[in-house]
Amino acid sequence: MEISYYELLEITQNADKETIKKAYRKMALKYHPDRNQGDKEAEDKFKLVNEAYEVLSNDEKRAIYDRYGKDALKGGGFGSNSSGFGGFEDLGDIFSSFFGEGFGSSSRRRKSSNDEKIPSDFIFNLKLSFKEAVFGCKKNIDFTYKCSCKTCNGTGAKDGKLQTCPKCQGRGQVGVSQGFITFAQTCPDCQGSGEKASEKCSDCKGLGYNESKDSVELNIPEGVDTGMKLRVNAKGNILKNGTRGDMYVKIIAAEDDTFIRDDDDIYIEFPVFFTQAILGESIKVPTIRGEATLNLPKGAKDGQRFVLEKEGVKDVHSSRMGNQIVQISIKFPTSLNDEQKELLEKLSESFGIKDGMHQEQKGLFEKITNWFKS
């Protein structure tokens, strides 16, 4: 079932124009491509939100939509404005009207020819074992960085000469039609600069940069985890002016077969024999640093959790220690010899279990029988 324009903007059908405008601003920000790079679902939602606003902000189109539905607006029902934004030249303009020049019109979104073709910083993904992440380690890594081409001054053009991009006519953006709406996107030929090399630099093959290799020894601190980033100063890309950015090392920590990590806490499921759970006992359990004593109380239950304080991971930013949580799994024998079977039968009888039924079970059956008789 197709979602309505009102549902897309999360408003009621009697919403006024100001409410529609505020709702559009909220949803457009939520699904804007700059905030959801690579998210196809968000991109589709963004297009639908713009489509909904275009209709509901126009009294005539809204009236047609309310009465006949979306299909009635197809086939020229949107008037003569081919942009589909009712007076806005492109997507940059519509955002500029709502959010100010920070989102930029088409002229503001165009990159300057003086812009760098490479960012100063970059991310390096570093895989660590479970133990390396928990206890820290030293790592020698080899990496590749980019250096702005000196031959063309980072332009990618022979002799550094650029011409106006013929595809976007120097605007840095091109229009892409989606049904009855035209969206603006960065020009694929000039990457938004509005300028293009008439002849590529032979040194960098038109890229504007060359690649070089480097290496560095890293001291990985104790307690890092997946997603954390460590900054390595002055190991990033080299820009036109000679400034070198930073490299950010992103940690990807492996999982362990025995221990489960949740931030600084460690979880483990540990088997306990049923007699140990019934009688209570001090048992040894493995920890990330060796072993620790767990005092099982009498009558411990299957799945019950116990906390071993400060047996977890050290916090990467302080001296605080996490805990280890032990969840017990009660195990029962799968086979018995004659002596064991006899002992268990005697134990069962000592608890008042006769004819395969415990006294509490008998009481329940009697209660149900009386219920049927009443």
Curated annotation (Swiss-Prot):
Binds 2 Zn(2+) ions per monomer. GO terms for biological process: chaperone cofactor-dependent protein refolding; DNA replication; protein refolding; response to heat. Signal peptide: none annotated. Coiled coil: none annotated. Belongs to the DnaJ family. Participates actively in the response to hyperosmotic and heat shock by preventing the aggregation of stress-denatured proteins and by disaggregating proteins, also in an autonomous, DnaK-independent fashion. Unfolded proteins bind initially to DnaJ; upon interaction with the DnaJ-bound protein, DnaK hydrolyzes its bound ATP, resulting in the formation of a stable complex. GrpE releases ADP from DnaK; ATP binding to DnaK triggers the release of the substrate protein, thus completing the reaction cycle. This is Chaperone protein DnaJ. It comes from Campylobacter jejuni subsp. jejuni serotype O:23/36 (strain 81-176).
